């Protein structure tokens, strides 16, 4: 009998915290499957999910205000351990008979909590031991309210000077609450705390590993598809590449990929995609060379949103034309990942997930009367990358920097022309090449060059050059929601600038973007 890697599972209820997806990623890293659902999840759905434990996440609301979110009673009726984090601790306390009030001194940022009570959750976990033998933890706080009265059968677990009940525990029922955030890296022992709750208190087994995920996904694809044929739009990005590798391993020649070359790809990208999948892996890949069609459709358009729509619409036209040449296609594969599922569920719906269509294929499944195959829909991006390595894809492909769906079309400011794309491709290649040489490529989260449709005077030898300006962009980020510009060494920037200006005739000036997000976005358009 096949191993059920979903058998040991954790339910995470979302009360609106910016960290909720991070909790889910941390649970998965421990090796346990989990799902994230809105706080008002239906009672019957909770019982059907049958978790071995529940985590109540944080949120921006105040428990003592009218109509603030509450945890479904079904959670406390399950008879499984429950872990409340920040707002989750507060609503647990209030619902079980305790009290919560606004705090005169709010806590945001780093803090030290003293572990003042014995519990299965924190015993043996500490950052400091003071002269009196008191254990301390370095944590991340983000709260304006606090628990002022414990529910019956709870005892104080941790405290700070301004928050005497910074943690609470009822070991008999396996109920715990902490006012800090164990899911963020700022809480040094956060991983150990979550692991203690999930593995020791909930009794979960670490079944969720890349090798087992690959085996399970392959088995599911074979069961769903049978002997039918599957079509995949292969872009060369991480998600579609991992889907291609997974499907090829699962169903072999039943998979056909269409790779649309829109003329807006990185230098040699088309050749690299074909070499990797068609030549090395033996995947059936149709390369549609549509550069002229894309550039003709983009002619004269400078509005960023309109450019995106033109590129998306043209992709569908080309993809549709190629797919119509194929016989007996029954399934369309997409690289939908778990954050897409979460975002598409709708705010606090508590209903079944509605999967977001991939930005490239739009309404194609309905138009072509195809059924969907989405083998990555349970996975976060970091899990997709690890799965890619498990399937044998090269590290440099799996951990390549993000590239926008419209490609260079949104890195060329204003109208898109072949001349601009050719110049930008070469400049971008030089930047990435030098980052790799200097061992900076994997130290930054994303790096690229932007073409600016303005000219600047330069001097080359004894002559005057009037040519284009490009900007280098490199950022560091954890979640791409916020980002800081990367402080690259001046010597590296000098090397990149010198090479670009000397090797590319159409460029006379190179600038470096030192804007962080917010207020700027990572991409320029």
Swiss-Prot record:
Q: Which CDD domains match?
A: GATase1_GMP_Synthase, GMP_synthase_C
GO MF, one annotated term: ATP binding
What does UniProt give as GO cellular component? cytosol
- Metabolic or biological pathway, per its Swiss-Prot or TrEMBL entry: Purine metabolism; GMP biosynthesis; GMP from XMP (L-Gln route): step 1/1
Q: Which PROSITE patterns match?
A: GATASE_TYPE_1, GMPS_ATP_PPASE
- Report the coiled-coil segments: none
Q: Which residues form the active site?
A: 86, 181, 183
Record-annotated GMPS ATP-PPase domain positions? 208-400
Superkingdom per UniProt? Bacteria
Q: Which residues bind ATP?
A: 235-241
Ranges for domain Glutamine amidotransferase type-1: 9-207
Family matches, as SUPFAM superfamilies: Adenine nucleotide alpha hydrolases-like, Class I glutamine amidotransferase-like, GMP synthetase C-terminal dimerisation domain
Is ATP-binding among the key words of this record? yes
Catalysed reaction equations from the record: XMP + L-glutamine + ATP + H2O = GMP + L-glutamate + AMP + diphosphate + 2 H(+)
Q: How does this chain assemble?
A: Homodimer.
Q: What is this protein for, i.e. what is its function?
A: Catalyzes the synthesis of GMP from XMP.
According to UniProt, the name of this protein is: GMP synthase [glutamine-hydrolyzing]
Which source organism does the UniProt entry give?
Pseudomonas syringae pv. tomato (strain ATCC BAA-871 / DC3000)
